[in-house]
Amino acid sequence: MFFAFAVLLIALATREAYGESQLNTKFILGSGNQVMFENINKEYNTHLKWDDDLAAKAMVEAVRPHYRLLWNTGDYFTIRNDKLFTKRYVGPLEEKVRLVLLNPFKKYADKLRQLPEGTTYGCNGFFDTDTMPNDNYLYVACVYNIPN
């Protein structure tokens, strides 16, 4: 319930920030996409556990900091990135997400591998398909909660 509310709140806040006619977002996390994020993270650490609430926090983190209308509270390790894709590029979603996360995951590979067992995480993101006429922006973030 909290997850659905958070996603709705982010969608409304983003629409308010950009104007309804200027932004058409397609949320990534949906049926089948949790598995995509799990597969990407398992390449670095097999002890991580998915958390829907952290996926909702990742939606907030996916937005660039200077555009955020909401802020996450808490002590989390976050990886985020965004990438511009031409509208002519019609590759599969998983390939695009991997391209967006490639450099930040390489940068934090050691930290990801050292996350202890019991660490929970969630990933999320969205497409901005209308702001630029010939390009789409893909925003993705993963949020990790390390147990005490």
Curated annotation (Swiss-Prot):
The keyword Secreted applies. Keywords: Secreted, Signal. Residues 1-19 form the signal peptide. It is found in: Secreted. Its main location: secreted. GO terms for cellular component: extracellular region. It comes from the Eukaryota. To T.colubriformis 30 kDa antigenic glycoprotein. This is 15 kDa excretory/secretory protein. It comes from Haemonchus contortus.
